[in-house]
């Protein structure tokens, strides 16, 4: 609580002090949040890339199987 008898200049200084401190705290919070979101984004992209590679490999294996079957059929003709 602010004591009576403080000058308006002192009150203004105190107000600015808390305002600047609040901005720094907000910046720190935002930077920490951004860092966590960037890490999560990297993790999600890695998982998506891994899943994409699995699907791609599976499709390639399917195509190879079809190719082998067609070659067998052609040889039997």
Curated annotation (Swiss-Prot):
Q: What is its EC number?
A: 7.1.2.2
| Coiled coil location | none
The record's Gene Ontology biological-process terms are:
proton motive force-driven ATP synthesis; proton transmembrane transport
Is Zinc given among the entry's keywords? no
Q: Which top-level enzyme class is recorded in the Swiss-Prot or TrEMBL entry?
A: translocase
Q: Name one Pfam family in it.
A: ATP-synt_E_2
ATP-binding found in the keyword field:
yes
One term under GO cellular component:
proton-transporting two-sector ATPase complex, catalytic domain
The chemistry this enzyme catalyses reads: ATP + H2O + 4 H(+)(in) = ADP + phosphate + 5 H(+)(out)
InterPro entries referenced in this protein's UniProt entry, alphabetically: ATPase_A1-cplx_e-su
GO MF annotation terms: ATP binding; ATPase-coupled transmembrane transporter activity
The record's keywords, sorted A to Z, are: ATP-binding, Hydrogen ion transport, Ion transport, Nucleotide-binding, Translocase, Transport
How it assembles, according to the record, is: Sul-ATPase is composed of six (or maybe five) subunits: alpha, beta, delta, gamma, C (proteolipid), and possibly epsilon.
Q: Family, per the entry?
A: To E.hirae NtpH.
Record protein name field: Membrane-associated ATPase epsilon chain
Q: Name the gene behind this protein.
A: atpE
């Amino acid at each position: 609580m602010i004591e009576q008898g403080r000058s308006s200049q002192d009150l203004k200084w105190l107000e600015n002090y808390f305002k600047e401190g609040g901005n720094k705290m907000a910046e720190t919070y935002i930077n920490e949040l951004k860092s966590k979101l960037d890490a999560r984004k990297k993790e999600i992209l890695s998982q998506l890339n891994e899943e994409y590679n699995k699907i791609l490999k599976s499709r390639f294996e399917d195509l190879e199987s079809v190719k082998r079957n067609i070659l067998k059929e052609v040889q039997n003709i």
